[in-house]
Amino acid sequence: MLKRFSISLDDNLLEIFDQHIAEKAYNNRSEAIRDLIRKNFVLKEWEEDRDVMGVISLIYDHHQSQLQKKVTDLQHDFHHHIVSTTHVHMDHDNCLEVIIVKGRAGDVIELADGLAALKGVRDSNLAMNSTGKSLH
């Protein structure tokens, strides 16, 4: 059941918010507000070290000595948090590794930080998601 409430914003903030709505192609302000609220609660789950889901992506030089072994070893150290991995050969030199993870936020962050710190990793990202349990 939806509940209606109102908020007050100054003109400048409302203008910025309406630009955001247009850029993201929301149908209305309510959808945009709901999305912002959900994102805030997902962030809170991570801050409170709750059970979360996430996606770690890495781009690395596969010619870097021992890097693939280090990536694999670190994943094995956190095997109980890894749901799935996908490895893509981007070109002759670069690989993309996508790792779907689940577990306590602190453990997931530790894995992501460990992978990002490896010599030869050119780019890394952790997309922080929720398990969905608290977003009804």
Swiss-Prot record:
Binding-site list for Ni(2+): H76, H87, H89, C95
The UniProt record lists the keyword Metal-binding: yes
SUPFAM superfamilies per record: ACT-like, Ribbon-helix-helix
CDD domains assigned to the protein according to its UniProt record, in alphabetical order: RHH_NikR_HicB-like
An example Gene Ontology molecular-function term: nickel cation binding
Protein task: Transcriptional regulator.
Entry similarity comment: Belongs to the transcriptional regulatory CopG/NikR family.
Protein name listed in UniProt: Putative nickel-responsive regulator
Organism in which the protein naturally occurs: Desulfotalea psychrophila (strain LSv54 / DSM 12343)
